Amino acid sequence: MMLAEQLSPEIQSSITIEYLNSSGQALKRKVIRNSFISLGRNEFRDLVLKVSDGKLQQNFVIKQIQLFTRFIRDGKASVVLLPENIQLLISNCPADKLKHFMKTLLIKHEAGKKEKPVNERTRLLSGLPRMFETISPVQKKDVEQANEMRAKANSETPVKGKGLSHKGVNGGNRCQQKRTRTESSNSLIADLRPSKKPTLSMPKQIRLSTEQSLVLNTVLSGRNVFFTGSAGTGKSYLLKRIVGALPPKSTYATASTGVAACHIGGTTLHAFAGIGSGKASLEQCIELAKRPGVRQHWTSCKHLIIDEISMVEGEFFDKLEAVARAVRGKDEPFGGIQLIVCGDFLQLPPVTQASSQTKFCFQGKSWRKCIHLTMELTEVRRQTDKNFISLLQAIRLGRCTDDVARQLLQTTNHKVERDGILATRLCTHKDDVEITNERRLQQLPGESHSYEALDSDPMLVKTINAQCPVNQQIQLKKGAQVMLAKNLDVSRGLVNGARGVVIKFEEGNKNLPVVRFLCGVTEVIKPDRWVFKGHGGIYLSRQQLPLKLAWAISIHKSQGMSLDCVEISLSRVFESGQAYVALSRARNLEGLRVMDFDPKVVRANPYVLQFYHQMQKERALRQTSLDDFLDKENC
């Protein structure tokens, strides 16, 4: 069952209230570190922003506003009240809640322009008691009224004025003169009206399954959680929602690999920790973590998210736990940091030296005292065919029955190619991937088109390469097999991993590629932007075409992807869980072709199987205890 998370028209954040003069300078400033901001209406049905610190409150009647939302992903936004010349700077607000709040404010304000305001004389003589009523949720009619007013404004002659370059809540750009001052000191009382206001839509609802909602609520209760689940159960999506529900200043989203970190808008666990590989002595690691910049990570962190935990080595996890206690000066597990850990130990294991034995995190000394609760997502979303889901579950547990082997062997003859789009080959070794893609591209006739990325800091290109899913340079030709590296339009099937072929290039100085996708959509692919955190908490970005060559891709790089048509060679599988990760990338059995299959490559680590068996046993005991308690209560 899917549940739509109801986001409230109230947010909790830090806020700075600035009273500006006509030049945009702050005459008076008030900072509230922990504020509650509510959207509602007063006795005259005016739109009102109520700001409270828990003791005192201040109401701001909204007449004209400007919204600045460029840094909304970081939990920051600004509301400028005109003509009062008051600026509200919101920060450290959970991103999902802030997006919903700002979208609601925008729609309600635009829709309200249709209503005739109450004049001052009527207000003075009304005798109505003061009141504040929380705003009702956005309805379809609000959006229709807002768009009606926008259409009317668009039909008028646009007026240009000075102001900030601004990206609005709904994605509209304002292209004005660039200012040299900071946002907090800008004069925002200009006769600014965008040349064309974009059409508004309903605020996006966050849809979670019952299982996912339970995990999210457990996280918000402050408990240390490890949640797991097989491939395609929505772990990454849930992690993004968890990131969006926590205060940004004290939340650090990390993952064992750069690509996984990029998917959740975070950084690598090693970059956050600042202790290198962790092979040094504990004393040396503590000294490394106490360096300026690194220490600030540890001391400001209240919520640490770790994705792809299966690839984190157990001894490294233990060392992090000890470092956290030492640097933070607290004896609680992990120095009192809330841990939100995600992954599937039945997928890819930690990368270790050939001579070393794999040690998973759950085998570490600190795991049990750090993790309060283990939860499992069981509802598979990537695949809908119950037979294929059952086959994958058997492979995940290292079981390859005669029936499973027969079905996989039959895929050898599957014709997964369609409309000139070939199957992507999943390879166990990344060297094979590069050789295959380069060779197949060179074999194509015609002119090669090169696309260089625009990086925020060319000096840190190695860091960007490690975290960004697309290369610094992309070479394409007509007929090149490609896949999307980012969700562009989920409703049209343009999702991360969607397969396509380059059919032509747009004429002009940019020569943008035109791609026909397997889902039936033909699209001009334009550069997109990835933003992620580097060392020291600095933000890095790359602007590049969201495309990758797709004749081949490594199993490691495919983790978290859903592929339309895939060919797998399992003869060189060398790790437990690798065959499962590869096979579970396919959306269905019809889009899968397995070459040189050997049942011996299907294996699961026995220690991991034991861990999951124990986990399910403990969960069954908890459920039995809960049922007994409820039975007694109902007697």
Swiss-Prot record:
Q: What is its EC number?
A: 5.6.2.3
The listed locations are:
Nucleus; Mitochondrion
Q: Which UniProt keywords apply?
A: ATP-binding, DNA damage, DNA recombination, DNA repair, DNA-binding, Helicase, Hydrolase, Isomerase, Mitochondrion, Nucleotide-binding, Nucleus
The record's principal subcellular location, in a coarse class, is nucleus
Q: Where do the record's region annotations for Disordered lie? A: 150-187
- Any one annotated GO CC term: nucleus
Highest taxon in the source lineage: Eukaryota
Top EC class, one word? isomerase
Q: Which residues make up the binding site for ATP?
A: G229, S230, A231, G232, T233, G234, K235, S236
State the DNA-binding region(s). Answer: 578-597
User: How does this protein assemble?
Assistant: Monomer.
The record's similarity note reads:
Belongs to the helicase family. PIF1 subfamily.
Q: What protein is this chain from? A: ATP-dependent DNA helicase PIF1
What is the native source organism of this protein?
Xenopus laevis
Tell me the organism's taxonomic lineage: Eukaryota, Metazoa, Chordata, Craniata, Vertebrata
